[in-house]
């Protein structure tokens, strides 16, 4: 998930079986939705050539956006299990788009990327997949998880990545919820769910206009409204929204982020959001005069290839195990193609040490399972549980600074 490029086109290639689909946009639009399974709405942008940094684009009709059941007025119980901003907490990014139960998809993985130990039972559709991964996250000492969210079928963003005939971004959520419910019934420790808002879906929206702000918001609404509030990750009573970068945003300012919380409070019992923004959100974009943008937290993506970022303005200790996308990416660093060796775990361990020493209260592991960029720390055939164990060792050390996290209900 590199700035402006990412491996979205690769993910689509890996995910899609070769079958006849209902719609096809012109070929050569990398990173866009250019295949639409039967029964899904065709994105308004399917036949446009979208480019990062392109001109501002109105998101158009939001008729495709449908909230889940956990939203007012029909749902009224918004009691949360909340952490405190004084706690030391750890999280990771969960790329739940995989379905390796299909032999063709698995074949495109094998020999190129790390593979989970039981790929025949590794799918976004399977509750047991999420339950196993969530339990391993708990074993790593993590407090909450950040599933990457790419919106609903039909949204105008550049990436919809349908895993035909299923749509992973929405259809994976019920399986995650069932996994949490199973653990709850079994008396397992809770793992809360926050939202990793993949802003590459924003399709050059202007987030200072009424239409742009509402598009920005409905993705948050439709993610959280699909998950029972007791499972939401919250800090100081505010559900977490973790923003990726601004490459696919044409304009924004402080009002863009304020709108998220204002609208969320209207729909979810007065709750406001705990917004952690990527470093590109520090100042407005496309707005004259420029202005500062603030929120609850700040991180910088890129620890996996570049190492620990010591910039003093950051509130999140971002760590990563290394990075490798040169199996398919050519052109060197200037094209965001990197091969950063894991050094047998030493690259990751050094960053974990720096994270503990930094004094920052939030640690984010980049990533749990973005296999196609070689940033995975989950259990795999290639690395076993090495990175889970390393994470646990240093998360325990981090939390030892203040004791266990405080959870209020």
Tell where the protein language model's regions lie, with residue ranges.
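Bacterial N-terminal signal peptides
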Residues: 8-17
């Amino acid at each position: 998930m590199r700035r402006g490029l990412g491996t979205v086109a690769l993910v689509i290639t890996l995910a899609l079986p070769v079958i006849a689909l209902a719609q096809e946009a012109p070929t050569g639009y990398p990173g866009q939705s250019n295949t639409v399974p039967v029964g899904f709405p065709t994105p308004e942008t399917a036949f446009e050539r979208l480019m990062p940094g392109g001109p501002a684009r109105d998101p158009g009709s939001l008729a495709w956006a449908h909230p889940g059941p956990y939203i007012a007025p029909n749902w009224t119980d918004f009691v949360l299990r909340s952490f405190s901003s004084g706690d030391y907490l750890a999280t990771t990014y969960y790329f739940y788009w995989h379905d390796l139960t299909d032999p063709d998809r698995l074949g495109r993985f094998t020999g190129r990327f790390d593979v989970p130990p039981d790929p025949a039972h590794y799918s976004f559709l399977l509750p047991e997949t999420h339950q196993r991964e969530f339990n391993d996250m708990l074993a790593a000492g993590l407090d909450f998880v950040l599933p990457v969210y790419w919106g609903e079928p039909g949204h105008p963003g550049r990436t919809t990545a349908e895993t035909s005939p299923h749509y992973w971004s929405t259809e994976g959520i019920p399986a995650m919820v069932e996994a949490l419910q199973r653990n709850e019934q079994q008396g397992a420790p809770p793992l809360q769910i926050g939202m990793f808002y993949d802003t590459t879906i924003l399709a050059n929206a202007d987030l200072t206009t009424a239409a742009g702000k509402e598009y920005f918001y409905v993705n948050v609404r439709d993610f959280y409204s699909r998950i029972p509030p007791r499972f939401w990750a919250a800090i100081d009573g505010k559900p977490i929204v973790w923003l990726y970068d601004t490459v696919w945003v044409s304009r924004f300012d402080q009002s863009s982020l304020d709108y998220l919380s204002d609208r969320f409070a209207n729909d979810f019992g007065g709750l406001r959001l705990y917004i952690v923004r990527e470093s590109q959100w520090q100042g407005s974009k496309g707005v004259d005069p420029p202005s500062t943008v603030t929120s609850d937290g700040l991180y910088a993506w890129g620890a996996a290839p570049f190492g620990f970022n010591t910039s003093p303005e950051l509130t999140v200790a971002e760590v990563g195990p290394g990075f490798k996308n040169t199996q398919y990416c050519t052109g060197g660093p200037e094209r965001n193609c990197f091969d950063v060796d894991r050094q047998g775990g030493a690259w990751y361990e050094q960053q974990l040490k720096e994270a503990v020493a930094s004094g920052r209260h939030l640690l984010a592991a980049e990533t749990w399972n973005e296999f196609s960029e070689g940033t995975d720390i989950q259990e795999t055939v290639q690395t076993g549980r090495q990175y889970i164990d390393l994470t646990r060792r240093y998360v325990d050390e981090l939390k030892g600074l203040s004791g266990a996290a405080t959870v209020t209900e």
